[in-house]
Structures are given as C-alpha cells and as structure tokens.
Amino acid sequence: MLLSKDVMSPVPDLLKRITIDANRMHGRPCIRGLRVTVADILGLLSAGQSRETILQEYPYLEAADIDAVLAFAARQADHPIIAAE
C-alpha cells in the first residue's frame, strides 16, 4: 500500500509536503522546506531502512512525509519521454 494507514489525505494534499526552492538544497525537492531531500529518503528506503527506523532517526519527520516522498517519486517516474524526430 502506498499510503500509511494513518494518512487519510489524497495524493495532491500529500504532494504539498514536497517543496522546491532554488535557495534551499540547490533546488532539490525537500520535505516541508526542511533540509531533508526526497532523494535522501528514497536512498534510505532503497537501502532497506524501514519507515519506522527513518522516523526514529529523523524525529521531525512524520509518516505522511514518507508517503509524500513515495507519491512524488511515483509521479516523477510516470512522466512520459517524447523522443525528438
């Protein structure tokens, strides 16, 4: 399941948690304006870290932040690429 059981908000509301600011973290997508990037959390998840461990190591993050990271990544991966002819 993409969303945690305690999150009832639809994906567009989750995506509001992802911020992009050219003056923060070189414009990379961050969580709620914090200095934690989407790539940071994706890297931890892909390395096998559990959501619970990530939330313990980053106590200022919420379960919905991890849901937002996954929703953002899914949207980014779904962008079509059109080849130039």
Task: Map each language-model feature to its residues.
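Small, basic N-terminal interaction modules of short regulatory proteins
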Residues: 1-85
